[in-house]
Amino acid sequence: MKKNGKDGWNLFEQLKKNEVTVAGANQEALDPVVTGAKDMVIAGVDYMTYSAKAKGEPVDIVYPKSGTVISPRAAGIMKDSKNVEGAKEFIDYLLSDDVQKQISKAYLLPGRTDIKAENRPNVEEIPVLNIDWKTVEKEQDEIGKQFKKVFQ
C-alpha cells in the first residue's frame, strides 16, 4: 500500500464498489467461488484451490504478474526448550524426504529446494512481491484501520 500510496487505496475502493467482500477463513472464502456464487477470490490460499481443482471443481489460480505474497509455514526450536535434541529430531523429520513429498502431495510448497512440487508451481516459479516487512510491521495498525474503514 505504501509503495502505491493513493493508487493502492483507490484499488480497494473500486473493489468495494464491485461488491467484493472480506470473507473469513480460507475455505469460507473459496466455497462461494466453487459454488459459483462469486466469480473469484483474492488472496486465498492456493493449496486449497489446487486441491479443489484436482477434485474436478471449475477453479484455477492466476498469480499476478506484479507478484504475490508467499507465506511460509515455519517450524523452529524455542531457545528455552526443555528438549532441544528431541526438537531437532522433529525438525529433521519435518524436513525428511518422505514428509516433504507428503507436503507436496497436499498441494503445499515443500520447504526444501531439492524437493519439487509435482502438482503446482514451485516457489521459484511464482512471482513474489518485494515487501519491506519492517515498514509493514511499523504501519500495520494504521493499514488495518484504513482497510476496515474501506470494507466495513
Q: What is each model feature region?
A:
Residues 1-2, 72-83, 102-103:
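A bilobed periplasmic-binding-protein/Venus flytrap-type ligand-binding module shared by bacterial periplasmic
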Residues 1-64:
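Ligand-binding pocket segment of bilobal, Venus flytrap-like solute-binding proteins
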Residues 59-68, 73-76:
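Flexible, solvent-exposed loop/hinge segments that line or gate ligand/substrate-binding clefts
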Residues 90:
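Substrate/cofactor-recognition hotspot
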Residues 111-152:
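An extracytoplasmic/periplasmic, membrane-proximal ligand-sensing/linker region
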